[in-house]
Amino acid sequence: MAQLTQMTNEQLRELIEAVRAAAVGAAGSAAAAGGADASRGKGNFSACTHSFGGTRDHDVVEEFIGNIETYKDVEGISDENALKGISLLFYGMASTWWQGVRKEATTWKEAIALIREHFSPTKPAYQIYMEFFQNKQDDHDPIDTFVIQKRALLAQLPSGRHDEETELDLLFGLLNIKYRKHISRHSVHTFKDLLEQGRIIEHNNQEDEEQLATAKNTRGSKRTTRCTYCSFRGHTFDNCRKRQKDRQEEQHEE
């Protein structure tokens, strides 16, 4: 049969205080967690430094959208608050445009779609190809810059249009001849391969130019002197034989 444990009044008070403290602590933790959850989603764009003025440029628009999407996620801004505060990020033509279309956007996704639709509409594939093949690599264009620009255009095509091998085929003929002389098409299977080999060529060319400049300066510094009397190279005025001969003849005539 279980035995009852008798507690003194002092022990009973200590037990009650311990239970009360535990209850208060649990309530505080729950309130703090609830406050954190409540505060999450109540952020806004008031401190966001990214802005958009209405430039009709695909890269500019995508950079702006990417920046504000990241800011929204990091700050824990809800879709509702983001939609309410997106006007803070517009200025100039974009601000005027938003005043006219804001009622069309009832969700955050619709607002982003409107920005893309108006300032960066999807280009037809033929136009992208025209821009892609319009310019070849200039002699002074670094291969990194050229490849980045061309790949950005190809990225605007419908997803899955070309694999990487096909994109390399499209790009390879546009490379400057100084790269194609040293890089064969079958030696590169990825853009990483192409860039690595291209950088090696650029580094070697830079070394060649530096050595050529150094050699040119060295030749210039070792250039033989010119006699100011007879204008021939290889000797100076003081040891010019023609001057000495002419001087002897003058003395002889005297």
Swiss-Prot record:
Disruption phenotype: Strong reduction in the number of synaptic boutons at neuromuscular junction in third-instar larvae. Keywords: Membrane, RNA-binding, Synapse, Transport. Its main location: membrane. Induction: Up-regulated following stimulation of E347 brain neurons. The keyword Membrane applies. It is found in: Extracellular vesicle membrane; Synapse. Master regulator of synaptic plasticity that self-assembles into virion-like capsids that encapsulate RNAs and mediate intercellular RNA transfer from motorneurons to muscles. Arc1 protein is released from motorneurons in extracellular vesicles that mediate the transfer of Arc1 mRNA into muscle cells, where Arc1 mRNA can undergo activity-dependent translation. Intercellular transfer od Arc1 mRNA is required for synaptic plasticity at the neuromuscular junction. This is Activity-regulated cytoskeleton associated protein 1. It comes from Drosophila melanogaster. The lineage of its organism: Eukaryota, Metazoa, Ecdysozoa, Arthropoda, Hexapoda. The gene is Arc1.
